[in-house]
């Protein structure tokens, strides 16, 4: 083979080897502003970084509408979202599929892929559904174990004030759905609207009786509820969809880093309700940094060094 041809061929091979490295774009990792958002966002961030993926940290970017807008506009590349929010995103709250873990996942996966080129990866088995938690002393004194009991208590004129995010108060599939199903209506004087969506803040407000609050917006995987003396109320009518957390990534980014799906699959598969409650409690009750809690969990499980 002529030397010139050999030299040219070597350059082509070198370029082919070097191209992925040159083309590798930093992955913008985001999450919601609450405790679990910080935990899951840091888990995704650290898993990607452990495999040498360059990242931009946008963890705890904002509320659901903010983060959703960011990924659909390309400002974010990946973030953890909840399957049940598909009902809200696609204005499809009446479909019973959202109340079935597998059907809800398959539906939002299909819709987001078709409409937004967003890919839903393996979800966690946990259900982080919205709920209402009341102070233990109030629950015991008034025999409150379910939202039906709460409705009866309110109709009897019971004292009640709920700390919640504006999103929970306003979204049709959140507090208004509970009110409609159980036949009660909270007045403005019975609501304390708090910035952001961090249930650690709403639960703390109820525990400390801030501004007369004795109940809080909470999630099914919240760690601080029992630790701070509150009790979640069951939802016997099954008003809420299943909210299983899963990484959502832009299709173009997944094409660039196809191994991302297999890296994150076992991690999210390990996050059952008990595990998430414990990890969330480490942050919200013990005051540990979400970054450290995520790092310790990943190391303990052998997914990072």
From Swiss-Prot:
The keyword Glycoprotein does not apply. One of its GO terms (cellular component) is membrane. It comes from the Bacteria. One of its GO terms (molecular function) is transmembrane transporter activity. CDD domains: PBP2_OsmF. Residues 1-23 form the signal peptide. One of its GO terms (biological process) is amino acid transport. It is found in: Periplasm. The keyword Signal applies. Induction: Expression is sigma S-dependent. Induced by both osmotic shock and entry into stationary phase. It holds the Pfam family OpuAC. Keywords: Amino-acid transport, Periplasm, Signal, Transport. InterPro entries: ABC_Gly_betaine_transp_sub-bd (IPR007210). Belongs to the OsmX family. The complex is composed of two ATP-binding proteins (YehX), two transmembrane proteins (YehW and YehY) and a solute-binding protein (YehZ). Part of an ABC transporter complex involved in low-affinity glycine betaine uptake. Binds glycine betaine with low affinity. This is Glycine betaine-binding protein YehZ.
């Amino acid at each position: 083979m002529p030397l010139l041809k050999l030299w040219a061929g070597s350059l082509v091979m070198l370029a082919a080897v070097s191209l992925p490295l040159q083309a590798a774009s930093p992955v913008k990792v985001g999450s919601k502003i609450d405790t679990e958002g910080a935990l899951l966002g840091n888990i995704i961030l650290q898993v990607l970084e452990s495999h040498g993926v360059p990242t931009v940290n946008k963890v705890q970017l904002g509320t659901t509408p903010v983060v959703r807008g960011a990924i659909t506009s390309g400002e974010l590349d990946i973030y953890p979202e909840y399957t049940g929010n598909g009902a809200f995103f696609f204005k499809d709250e009446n479909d019973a599929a959202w109340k079935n873990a597998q059907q809800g996942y398959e539906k939002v996966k299909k819709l987001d892929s078709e409409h937004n080129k967003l890919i839903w990866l393996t979800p966690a088995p946990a259900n982080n559904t919205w709920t209402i938690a009341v102070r233990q002393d109030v629950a015991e004194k008034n025999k409150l174990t379910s939202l039906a009991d709460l409705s009866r208590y309110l109709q009897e004129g019971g004292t009640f004030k709920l700390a919640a995010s504006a999103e929970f108060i306003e979204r049709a599939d959140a507090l208004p759905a509970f009110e409609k199903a159980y036949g009660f209506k909270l007045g403005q004087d019975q609501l304390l609207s708090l910035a952001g969506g961090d249930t650690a803040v709403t639960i703390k407000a109820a525990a400390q009786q801030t501004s007369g609050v004795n109940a809080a917006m909470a999630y099914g995987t919240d760690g601080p509820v029992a630790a701070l003396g509150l009790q979640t109320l069951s939802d016997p009518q099954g008003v809420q969809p299943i909210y299983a957390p899963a990484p959502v990534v832009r299709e173009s980014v997944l094409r660039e880093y196809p191994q991302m799906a297999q890296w994150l699959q076992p991690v999210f598969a390990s996050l059952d309700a008990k595990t998430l409650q414990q990890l969330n409690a480490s942050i919200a009750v013990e005051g540990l940094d979400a970054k450290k809690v995520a790092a310790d969990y990943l190391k303990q499980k052998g997914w990072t060094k």
